[in-house]
A protein has these predicted regions:
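Short hydrophobic alpha-helical segments enriched in small aliphatic residues
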Residues: 11-14
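Adenine nucleotide-associated cytosolic modules
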Residues: 2, 6-7, 20-185
Length: 185
């Protein structure tokens, strides 16, 4: 579309077609490749902007997930992790860098995510998930993405999402194999 009549005219057309006057010109430019997709469009981009995703774990799985959520324009991302960045994390936990070694992973993650997209909100929770805090953590989010690295946390998050009626996306990795499942209430 942009080759035929220019991106500026496309953006104006997209704005009119989807009634998404809430998107600014810079936002339309930032998300233009998503807006071009019929499955997303301007309305879908507005939904992403209003979405709230809680990311449990800012390590090997949470790192790429967080990067893509921020780049896609998810409006609010919550990061939950009680760990700090270690040098041994850096080859697989791409949310972090040498400069953030020793920093809480949630703070390192926030720094990276807001550098990618300064328009999003990143809430940080430097804590481990437990029976006392899981339900309060979930309450303000639409979707929970579990990238934790142990079964007890996974079971707890699954149970909490069930009782709180939250959509759960659960991912795990072992060596070169991965699994992903989505559970809707």
């Amino acid at each position: 579309a942009s080759l035929v009549f220019g991106f500026g005219r496309f953006a104006l057309h997209e704005r009119r077609e989807t009634n998404c006057m809430e998107l600014t010109e810079p936002q339309i430019q930032r998300y233009s490749r998503q807006i071009l997709l019929g499955e997303v469009g301007g309305k879908g981009q507005m939904k992403l902007r209003q979405a709230k995703v809680l990311l449990i774990g800012a390590g090997g799985l949470g790192s790429p997930a967080g990067l893509y959520l921020a780049a896609a324009g998810v409006g609010t991302i919550g990061l939950v992790d009680g760990d700090v960045v270690d040098l041994s994390n850096l080859q697989r936990q791409i949310l972090h860098s040498t400069a953030t070694v020793g920093m809480p992973k949630v703070e390192s993650g926030k720094k990276t995510l807001t550098a990618i997209n300064p328009e999003i909100t990143v809430n940080t929770y430097h804590q481990l998930v437990d029976t006392d805090n899981i339900l309060p953590l979930l309450k303000d989010y639409d979707v929970v993405l579990d990238g934790s690295d142990n079964f007890s946390t996974r079971f707890l998050v699954n149970d909490a999402c069930f009782f709180a009626k939250k959509t759960l996306i659960s991912a795990s990795m072992f060596r070169f194999e991965g699994q992903l499942t989505t559970i809707k209430p």
